[in-house]
Amino acid sequence: MDLDFVRGLRQAELDLALTEIASRKPTGSSIVEIGGGGGWQAGMLTEAGFRVRSFDLAGSQFSAHRTFPIEDYDGHRIPAADASFDIAFSSNVLEHIPHVRSFQAELHRVLKPDGIAVHLLPTASWRVWTLAAHYPWLVKAGAEAFRATRGGRRSDDAHVVARAVQRRSRTQLVSRILLSPRHGEAGNAVSEIWHFSRHRWTPLFEETGWRVVSRGTNGLFYTGYSVLGWQLSLTARRRLSHLLGASCHVYVLEKASASRANSASAPPAAVTVQAKAAQ
C-alpha cells in the first residue's frame, strides 16, 4: 500500500468534510474521531482549529504509522463523558465495525444534543470498481514479487502476495487469487455492492436515531487497490468520478431528537395563517 497516495486521498476528502463541518460548527468546536488510523486527518483537523480526540483499536492497520496521539479503545465504549463533543467524525471506518448499529448509540451518548456526525463511507461504485481492479492488481503484485526474487526491491503489494502464499492453504490461496476479498464486516465482496449503497446507509442511520442533513460524495474516483496510484492525478480522478462514480459518500447527520425539538420550538406558521384567514 502506497501510504503517501492514501494520505493524499484522505487530505482531499478531509478538505471536503471540513467545508461541511465549518458551515455548521465554529472553529474551536470539539471533535471525536473514530478509527483515527495514522492520525493524518486528526492532525489536519487540529491544524484547522478544532479540538480533537481520536480513537482506534490498538492493533489497527496504521498503528505503526501514527503521527497524532491516537487513544486506544476497545471498539465498543468511547472513553469520554456523556455529551462531550460537538462533532463525531469518521472516514472509511463504519463499514469495519461489526456492531455498527449498536455503536450508533455510543456516538449519540458522547455527542452534545445539538451535535452533528460527519461520516465518509465507501460507495457501491467503489465496490464495483474494486472488484474489477482485483485482477490488474494481481498481475502487478505478481510481477513485482517475481522481480523481488531476482534481487529487486519488494513493493508493498508484493509483500501482500508473499504473505498470502505463506499463510493460506492451497484452497484458500486459489480463492484469494480468484476472488476479491470483502472489505467490511457484512456480506461478501459482491453483496457489498448493496451494503455500501445509500439504500443501506441511509436507513441504517434513520433507524438508529439520526436525521440525514445532507448526503453527497467525495467527488473522487479510486479503487481499493490503488493500482495506478499517483499516475492518475486528483484532477483526473475528479473527472473520472463523473463517469464511473465517486468512491465515498459524505453523510452529515444530526440527532433526530434535536430535529424534533427544533420543530416543536418553531412557530406554527401554517396555523397562524389559517387563523388570520378565519378572522
Go through the PLM ranges and name each one:
Residues 101-102, 106, 116-252, 256-258:
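S-adenosyl-L-methionine-dependent methyltransferase catalytic module, highlighting the catalytic core
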Residues 97-98, 111-113:
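Helix-to-beta-strand junctions that scaffold the AdoMet/dcAdoMet cofactor pocket
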Residues 87-98:
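A short SAM/SAH-binding and catalytic strip from SAM-dependent methyltransferases
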Residues 5, 9, 33, 37, ...:
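Conserved aromatic-histidine-acidic binding/catalytic patches
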Residues 77, 95, 124-126:
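Active-site micro-motifs of SAM-dependent methyltransferase domains
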Residues 1-81, 87-89, 104, 220, ...:
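Conserved N-terminal segment of class I S-adenosyl-L-methionine
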